[in-house]
UniProtKB/Swiss-Prot annotation:
Keywords: Aminoacyl-tRNA synthetase, ATP-binding, Cytoplasm, Ligase, Magnesium, Metal-binding, Nucleotide-binding, Protein biosynthesis, RNA-binding, tRNA-binding. One of its GO terms (biological process) is phenylalanyl-tRNA aminoacylation. Pfam families: B3_4 (PF03483), tRNA_bind (PF01588), tRNA_synthFbeta (PF17759). CDD domains: PheRS_beta_core (cd00769), tRNA_bind_bactPheRS (cd02796). Its cofactor is Mg(2+). PANTHER family: PHENYLALANINE--TRNA LIGASE BETA SUBUNIT, PHENYLALANYL-TRNA SYNTHETASE BETA CHAIN AND LEUCINE-RICH REPEAT-CONTAINING PROTEIN 47. This is Phenylalanine--tRNA ligase beta subunit. Tetramer of two alpha and two beta subunits. Residues 40-162 form the tRNA-binding domain.
């Protein structure tokens, strides 16, 4: 879901003075997860100007020469091909001009040019020139027409952003799965205003007397099957284009402007969460009814596609056939266009499961179907009708707008819930001083509850409130759980810093090394969808943690790998046209069986590359990835061995390796299979990935084992042993495994290492001192010492370790 700050400001005017970060915090406080914040990148050298004169180009019938005033005493000569400029009604209105030196977001640099004998000092901008990333949302004609703005102060020559609502900020959010009511910006604003402690303005009920001037033929025989079926009728309309302020708001929320009436209806849907179908009333034949389709039928829709209607689909139909697939899309036959004189605004509230099934079968996921595929309350429908009516109520429309075609009775509140305030405080973990009875009543009232002493009645649209424990979650929204003082947790397993064994320092050094190499450290969500959890599960982890009441399916389980999350970061940045780079992340991977620290990295761009010298930099390939893996592992004082992956689920055949330390597999590195990159919009682009389980390395550094034994009065007994390996086959860990098998040796230390030759073969000699454990209070005998020495030699011989006897 997209939330426009400017749209929200209609309901919470003071939100314009609230920082974006605070809005994010408060949205998260009421359970709404903020995925991203979108803000427009403003090109330099663009400004408002006034169109003073337009003449045909003397040498080209498709071009025009414009005089554009950009200051009180300065005009520019601009050649344009925008045909709407020749309309005499546009003279002395404001346009947006790109001056010499401007670099538009599509890469075009504006220069002074001689265009067929006429000097042009700039360019008149269309919306696509300014915001090319929204080209697919531009209304017909607006992609080539120069922007012409009405009702601007005649001396205004400055910033143009506010007149297109490009100074807006849009929050990309995910709603809790049990809060479909928050699809309505009205209900969302009420909760957000409560936690922001700002006034909110929501009510829009008309007090004007409206007449039933037009008996629109609605057949209500099937109305009982719907929560509501009806709408409004508007007559004698003049279809025009919406002002750019309205178009800008719609585009910001990824809705395509159409015309002034359809655009207003779409804005009402944004506020209320209730979709509206707009029909040209004069193109409707006979009566209109809501029904379940009984036979196969095709409908040419507003998007110029044909859709197959099957028995059981919910439709609105006239006597000639279907005019809308409810909650999904309308028919082109009754489309509102420039010839329309009378409009019927159709509103339906019906079982969302049936609409969801039809939308999935048809493969439609548009604005209307996303809303109607979830429950919509009668309060949202009632708000829709009121907002729709008020949007068109003005002196010119009196006598043109009808009453509601059908009555709607939406209860204001839900069932009664009896509250014990002390129980609430105990459940939340606060004192009466922190949350007294008066505060509880005020908080719940600000969230829309009706309070009668210790009885709370939730708003009827709050279907998620069923028991008194649910009320505690509402209070936490206002209290802000993050500000409640924490209780100290006493633990006997506190992390201790040791002067020699400090894993934190090792991780910090590794982070610095990777950042020096140009890798960006990112932090991604631990919670993902069950489907995504199966992606790139390199270590085959199972027994996942599941969230009981997740905000959404997208945040319902704890992940078991990091590469999927990193690929999502690349995908998101690519969608925003940001420059891509190499990234890495440290994060714990948790299952019900384990909790281990991983590092993952994606390498897809040249290291130390240059924009000016394309050949400069370190290209990514498997040797480079081996070097990266070795750098990470050597940071903890270990060496890494590599074993090939001949057939793998995730990496391209023969371009993947297992990472092995002390004969233990700790990670993978390789070229990610191309077909796996398709869901991330990276298919066809080589992406190398790496993921390492750092837990073993960190445990080796951080584990501090203590044993407490009485101080012995006996002298330590120790012996030395010398052994060797061929220099190229030195495996000291083989000796470590051998000596650990002897319970009679309680510690050992390496006292010398040197390289030499034996029979002309280079070897490495090791000398180890080992200490014998005394199980009695008497000195060890020579026989006991000799027995331990013999046992150690036997273990070495079994391990094929050459001893120096």
């Amino acid at each position: 879901m997209l939330i426009s700050k400017k749209t929200l400001a209609v309901l919470i005017p003071e939100i314009t003075h609230v920082s974006n970060n605070e809005i994010c915090e408060k949205l998260q406080q009421i359970g709404i997860e903020v995925e991203a914040i979108r803000a427009f990148k403003n090109p330099d050298y663009l400004q408002l100007g006034i169109l003073r004169a337009v003449t045909p180009h003397p040498h080209d019938n498709h071009l025009y020469v414009c005089q554009v005033q950009i200051d009180k005493n300065k005009q520019l000569n601009v050649v344009t091909g925008a045909v709407n400029i020749v309309d005499p009604n546009n003279l002395n209105k404001h346009v947006i001009v790109a001056k010499k030196g401007a670099e538009l977001l599509n890469g075009l640099i504006i220069k002074t040019k001689n265009i067929k004998g006429i000097i042009s000092d700039g360019m008149l901008c269309s919306y696509v020139d300014i915001n090319p990333f929204s080209k697919h949302l531009i209304a017909d004609g607006d992609d080539t027409h120069a922007i012409v703005l009405d009702n601007i102060n005649r001396d205004e020559f400055g910033d143009y952003l506010s007149f297109l609502n490009l100074d807006d900020v849009v929050f990309e959010v995910t709603l809790p799965t049990n809060r479909s009511d928050l699809q309505s910006l009205i209900f969302l604003a009420k909760e957000l205003a409560a936690v922001l402690k700002r006034p909110v303005f929501l009510e829009q009920k008309t007090t004007m007397t409206l007449r039933e001037f037009y008996r629109f033929p609605l057949n209500l025989r099937n109305r009982a099957q719907a929560n509501f079926f009806g709408g409004l009728f508007l007559r004698d309309v003049a279809i025009t284009s919406s002002p750019w302020t309205t178009k800008g708001l719609l585009i910001n929320q990824e809705l395509r402007p159409v015309n002034c009436f359809v655009d207003q209806a779409n804005m009402v849907t944004v506020y209320t969460g209730q979709p509206i179908h707009c029909h040209d009333a004069d193109k409707i034949h006979g009566s209109v009814e809501l029904k379940l389709a009984t036979q196969l039928e095709t409908m040419l829709a507003l998007d110029n596609k044909e859709y197959e209607i099957k028995p059981g689909d919910l439709v609105v139909a006239d006597e000639q056939g279907t005019i809308a697939i409810v909650g999904i899309i309308g028919s082109k036959r009754t489309m509102v266009d420039n010839t329309t004189n009378n409009i019927f605004f159709e509103v339906v509230n019906y079982n969302h499961e049936r609409i969801k099934q039809t939308a999935q079968r048809l493969g439609v996921a548009n604005f209307a179907s996303r809303l109607m595929s979830k429950p919509i309350s009668l309060q949202a429908t009632e708000n829709c009708l009121n907002y729709l009516q008020n949007n068109f109520l003005n002196p010119e429309s009196i006598g043109k707008i009808s009453k509601f075609s059908s009555t709607i009775k939406a209860p204001a509140f839900n069932r009664k819930i009896y509250l014990n305030f002390n129980q609430l405080r105990e459940l939340i973990g606060v004192t009466k001083k922190q949350l007294n009875d008066h505060m509880i009543r005020n908080y719940l009232t600000s969230l829309g509850f009706k309070m009668e002493n210790q009885i709370a009645r939730a708003p009827a649209y709050r279907q998620d409130i069923t028991v008194w424990q649910d009320i505690s979650e509402e209070l936490l929204k206002i209290l802000d759980l993050n500000k409640i003082k924490e209780d100290e947790i006493l633990s006997s397993t506190k992390l201790e810093k040791h002067e020699k064994l400090n894993a934190y320092d090792a991780l910090q050094k590794l982070r610095t090394k990777l950042q020096t190499l140009g890798f960006h450290n990112v932090i991604t969500y631990q919670l993902i969808s069950p489907e995504r959890a199966r992606n790139f599960n390199l270590f085959g982890l199972s027994n996942l943690w599941e969230i009981k009441n997740p905000l959404s399916n997208e945040r319902s389980v704890l992940r078991v790998g990091l590469i999927d999350s990193l690929l999502r970061v690349i995908q998101k940045n690519a969608a925003y046209k940001n420059k891509l780079g190499n990234i890495f992340e440290f994060s714990f991977v948790k299952t019900k069986d384990s909790n281990q620290l991983h590092i993952a990295a994606l390498w897809l761009e040249k290291m130390f590359g240059s924009t000016y010298q394309k050949d400069q930099g370190v290209s990514v390939d498997i040797p480079a990835m081996k070097g990266l893996a070795q750098l990470i592992i050597s940071n903890f004082g270990f060496n890494c061995d590599f074993e090939p992956i001949t057939e793998g689920e995730y990496f391209t055949k023969n371009v993947g390796l297992k990472l092995v330390v002390f004969n233990e597999q700790i990670g993978y590195v390789g070229l990610i299979k191309d077909e796996l990159l398709a869901p991330y919009d990276l298919k066809g682009r080589p992406v190398y990935g790496l993921e390492i389980n750092l837990d073993r390395l960190l445990n080796s550094l951080n584990r501090l084992e203590r044993s407490y034994t009485p101080i012995s009065k006996l002298q330590d007994v120790f012996k030395d042993i010398t052994f060797s390996f061929p220099r190229d086959e030195s495996h000291f860990e083989t000796f470590v495994k051998a000596i650990k098998k002897l319970q009679t040796i309680f510690k050992w230390e390496l006292i010398s290492v040197f390289d030499t030759e034996k029979d002309g073969v280079p070897i490495t000699k090791y000398t180890v001192r080992y200490y014998l454990k005394n199980f009695t209070n008497t000195p060890l005998t020579l026989e006991q010492i000799k027995a331990v020495e013999t046992q150690l030699k036997q273990q070495c011989e079994l391990a094929k370790i050459a001893l120096d006897l």
